[in-house]
């Protein structure tokens, strides 16, 4: 049960946390363009929680699963 809850929170953060720096500063992580996420994946994600969140968003985008975030957007 704990893992399911954690995954839900991980996804929720993508529609609530904003990018803290760079060209896409203040944009929701879920709204970052795929080409930027690909660049970050090649260049290296930042350390810590933000890097983990960006890596998750990259995986979601790369696998064509952005639609998974739509119900979470509607909740907010």
Give names to the regions the model predicted.
Residues 1-76:
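DEDD superfamily 3′-5′ metal-dependent exonuclease/proofreading module
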């Amino acid at each position: 049960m704990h893992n399911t809850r954690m995954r839900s929170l991980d996804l929720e953060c993508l529609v609530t946390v904003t990018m803290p720096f760079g060209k896409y500063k203040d944009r929701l992580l879920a709204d970052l363009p795929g080409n930027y996420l690909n660049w970050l994946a090649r260049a290296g994600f930042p350390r810590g929680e933000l890097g983990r969140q960006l890596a998750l968003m990259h995986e979601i985008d790369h696998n064509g699963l952005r639609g998974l975030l739509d119900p979470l957007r509607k909740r907010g």
